[in-house]
Structures are given as C-alpha cells and as structure tokens.
From Swiss-Prot:
Organism classification: Eukaryota, Fungi, Dikarya, Ascomycota, Saccharomycotina
Topology in membrane: Single-pass membrane protein
Purpose: Required for the assembly of the mitochondrial respiratory chain complex IV (CIV), also known as cytochrome c oxidase. May participate in merging the COX1 and COX2 assembly lines.
One of the GO biological process terms: mitochondrial cytochrome c oxidase assembly
Name by which UniProt lists this protein: Cytochrome c oxidase assembly protein COX16, mitochondrial
Cross-referenced InterPro entries: Cyt_c_Oxase_assmbl_COX16
Listed Pfam families: COX16 (PF14138)
The entry's keywords: Membrane, Mitochondrion, Mitochondrion inner membrane, Transit peptide, Transmembrane, Transmembrane helix
Entry keyword annotation includes Repressor: no
Tagged with keyword rRNA-binding: no
Superkingdom of source: Eukaryota
Transmembrane segments: 35-55
C-alpha cells in the first residue's frame, strides 16, 4: 500500500479530523507518547492490581472462615471417641473387605470370537 495502511483524506476531511478528539489525541500522542499512552497504561495496571487484590481477598476470607481454631472441649471430644489404631488389625480388616465384594464371572464373547481356553 502506498499510504502505509492509512486512508486518504481530503483537506476538509483532514481539518475536521484534526479538530476531533481522536485527531488532537493522535497529535499529542506523537509528541509525548509516554505521557499520553504509557502513563495511563501504567496507571490502569496499578489500579487494576489494587482492584483485583480486593476481589481475591474476599476469596481468602471465605476460605479462612471454614478453618477455625478448636477449643479444649472439642479436642477432648475428638480424643475420647477415637478407637485404638493397630496397623496389623487394619490390614487384615481391609483384606477381608475385598473378598466380599466380588465374584468371578466370565465375560460374554461375541459370535465367532474365541474363548481363549487352552
């Protein structure tokens, strides 16, 4: 493109554009890019950071409400109702549970499929 991607404007159109907000901003932006682009961008990043910090703090406060410190009475109640733990007893108890839940059963085969019985 000969105009570098810009559209051609007549003199009247260019004067009207220069008087518009976009034209004045573009002129100021070309003179001082940091003041008119960089500074607002950095400001938005800082303000966004503070805004998002407030939103995420609500999440952390809600999670902290779920976790509460226990008093002595609650600790004693937990210790009193607890049964003794023996690793061997738990092992044998879990071994017995596994035997009750299943029974051997052959999977039905499709017609013409071998039974793989040797």
């Amino acid at each position: 493109m000969a105009l570098g991607g810009r559209s051609f404007r007549s003199k009247k159109q260019q004067l009207a554009y220069d008087r518009s907000f976009a034209g004045r901003y573009q002129k100021l932006l070309s003179k001082n890019p940091f003041i008119f682009f960089g500074l607002p961008f950095c400001g938005m990043m800082v303000l966004g950071s503070y805004w998002l910090a407030g939103i995420s703090q609500v999440k952390f406060d809600r999670d902290d409400q779920k976790v509460q410190e226990m008093n002595e009475e609650e600790i004693l109640k937990m210790k009193h109702g607890k049964r003794e733990f023996d690793i061997k007893e738990e092992y044998y108890r879990l071994q017995g549970l596994a035997e009750e839940d299943w029974e051997p059963k052959r999977v039905e085969r499709f017609k013409g499929e071998s039974d793989n019985v040797f």
